[in-house]
Amino acid sequence: MIYIYEKKINLKMDQFLKENSRLIKNNNILLENETLLLIVDVQEKLIKNIKDYQLIIFNIKKLIDTCKLLNVRIAITEQNPLKLGKTLDAIIENNEYSYFEKMEFSCSKNMNFIKYISEYNFKNIIVCGIETHICILQTCIDLLQKDLNILIPRDAMGSRHEIDNDTAFIRLALSGAVASTTESLICELCKTSSRKEFKEVSKILKTSF
């Protein structure tokens, strides 16, 4: 009886592993040279309608500062910039990014963006910005279908309405995106307090809103 019971458990576990292979595969510690920070549509005419937008900008800047420090590449997308304005100066500053303009909601419909991902052989993409339930959702779903690991820091993304943001976040997590936070991802990229950059990373972490 014990053998039969254990066999049933093993069969259920095998079934679980098969059905959730994407979730398990995505549960890897980030490597800097395989990771891209993607900042989606943080534009002048969009941002101020977003719930808690100042906190979102604050956390995106923390991710930017960390990625610059650790040599993680950064890409920015802009949705119809002629109509919706350019990316906020607070995000751009004097930093060098890869820029991609788009009309489609999903960044993945931009062939130049897809070529960029392929060129640098990214395996992990941290996606932040706005809006969670439109451009971020469609981008992440498309990227997941390309077998990429997608990480979504909940405190660095948002929508105009809380219900849209929360519902999209749940769908993304169920679809295989890895739910996380800004601080967690910063520490995951840094990995150890023994590295030379940790002192500066620690300052970023201690910065309060």
Model-predicted segments: where are they?
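Short, solvent-exposed loop/turn segments at secondary-structure boundaries
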Residues: 49-53, 163-164
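Active-site-adjacent betaalpha module
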Residues: 14-36, 69-72, 82-209
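Acidic/proline-rich low-complexity IDRs
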Residues: 10-12, 16, 54
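Short beta-strand segments at enzyme active-site cores
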Residues: 38-40, 74-79
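N-terminal amphipathic/basic-hydrophobic helices that include classical n-h-c signal peptides
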Residues: 1-12
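Short acidic, Gly/Ser-rich segments with clustered Asp/Glu that frequently serve as metal-coordination loops
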Residues: 44-48
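A short alpha/beta connector and helix-capping loop motif
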Residues: 51-67, 72-75
